[in-house]
C-alpha cells in the first residue's frame, strides 16, 4: 500500500509544494508576520522534513515537537486557531494550484488539520 507521501509524488513533489507554500504564506497578511525574522531556508528544510514524516515518507523525524516549536509564538506573538487554519488553507490551496487530485488534498487536510495536531501547535 502506498503512503500519502508516495501518492503525492515523493521528495520532488513535497519539496516543490513546500517552496510554493511558503511563497503563498509570505504573501498572506493573516500570518506572514510570524515569519518576518525567520531564516526561510532553514524553515523550508524543517517543513520538508516534517511533511515527509507526517505523510509517511519516513518513520524518523528529528525536528522539535510541535508544542516546543510553537510555544514562543503562542505565548509571545498570539498564535491562535485562526492562524493555524490560515496555514492549513494555504497548504491546501498550494496543492490545488499544483494540480494535486482532490482525494489526495482531502488526505492532506486530514493530516494537517487533525485536532490533535492543532492542539499541539497551539499548546492546548
Swiss-Prot record:
Functional description taken from the UniProt entry: Forms a very stable complex with oxygen. The oxygen dissociation rate is 0.011 sec(-1).
Listed name of the protein: Group 1 truncated hemoglobin GlbN
Keyword Transferase set for record: no
Cofactors demanded by this protein: heme
Subunit structure: Monomer.
UniProtKB keywords: Heme, Iron, Metal-binding, Oxygen transport, Transport
Annotated Gene Ontology cellular component terms: cytoplasm
Coiled-coil features, chain-numbered ranges: none
Name of the gene encoding the protein in the UniProt record: glbN
GO molecular function, one term: oxygen binding
CDD domains (alphabetical): TrHb1_N (cd00454)
Gene Ontology biological process terms in this record: cell redox homeostasis; cellular response to oxidative stress
Protein family (similarity comment): Belongs to the truncated hemoglobin family. Group I subfamily.
Matches recorded under InterPro entries: Globin-like_sf, Globin/Proto, Globin_bac-like_CS, Hemoglobin_trunc, Hemoglobin_trunc_I
Highest taxon, organism lineage: Bacteria
Cofactor binding summary note: Binds 1 heme group per subunit.
Binding residue positions for heme: 46, 70, 117
Amino acid at each position: 500500500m502506498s503512503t500519502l507521501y508516495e501518492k503525492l509524488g515523493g521528495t520532488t513533489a513535497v519539496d516543490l509544494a513546500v517552496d510554493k507554500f511558503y511563497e503563498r504564506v509570505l504573501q498572506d497578511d493573516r500570518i506572514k508576520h510570524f515569519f518576518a525574522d525567520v531564516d526561510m531556508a532553514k524553515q523550508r528544510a524543517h517543513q520538508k522534513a516534517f511533511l515527509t514524516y507526517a505523510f509517511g515518507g519516513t518513520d524518523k523525524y528529528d525536528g522539535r515537537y510541535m508544542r516546543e516549536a510553537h510555544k514562543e509564538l503562542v505565548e509571545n506573538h498570539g498564535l491562535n486557531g485562526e492562524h493555524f487554519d490560515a496555514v492549513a488553507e494555504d497548504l491546501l490551496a498550494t496543492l490545488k494550484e499544483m494540480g494535486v487530485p482532490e482525494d489526495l488534498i482531502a488526505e492532506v487536510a486530514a493530516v494537517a488539520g487533525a485536532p490533535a495536531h492543532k492542539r499541539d501547535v497551539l499548546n492546548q
